[in-house]
Amino acid sequence: MKRIKSGDEVIVIAGKSKGHIGKVLRVIDDAVVVEGGNLIKKHIKPNPQKPENKGGIITREAPLHVSNVAHYNPVTKKADKVGFKYLESNGVSKKVRYYKSNNEIIDRI
């Protein structure tokens, strides 16, 4: 099961964007793209076949390895580990993600 999903709030714990808090835009295998984190400048060559591509230097987010980010717990305002557990309700057990520091449930899977 993936511990980090698209839309989660994470904090960068290593690299040039260390300390940056942002939302996960997308997950790519073992990498995540964090909103406003790990910004790079990309040089784009003009393409006459595509009128929207004028060329130049653009700034965009590059992927970060999942080991360089951690879940951000808004209650403790710190990086936190995520665990999985099963909760039983009405005879049906559901798998949930929770913060290990304060056992607060993040979401149901």
UniProtKB/Swiss-Prot annotation:
Molecular function in Gene Ontology: rRNA binding; structural constituent of ribosome
GO annotation, biological process: translation
Keyword Cytoplasm: no
GO cellular component: ribonucleoprotein complex; ribosome
Organism domain of life: Bacteria
Keywords: Ribonucleoprotein, Ribosomal protein, RNA-binding, rRNA-binding
Protein family (similarity comment): Belongs to the universal ribosomal protein uL24 family.
Subunit structure: Part of the 50S ribosomal subunit.
NCBIfam families, A to Z: rplX_bact
PANTHER family on file: MITOCHONDRIAL RIBOSOMAL PROTEIN L24
Function summary: One of two assembly initiator proteins, it binds directly to the 5'-end of the 23S rRNA, where it nucleates assembly of the 50S subunit. One of the proteins that surrounds the polypeptide exit tunnel on the outside of the subunit.
Protein name in the entry: Large ribosomal subunit protein uL24
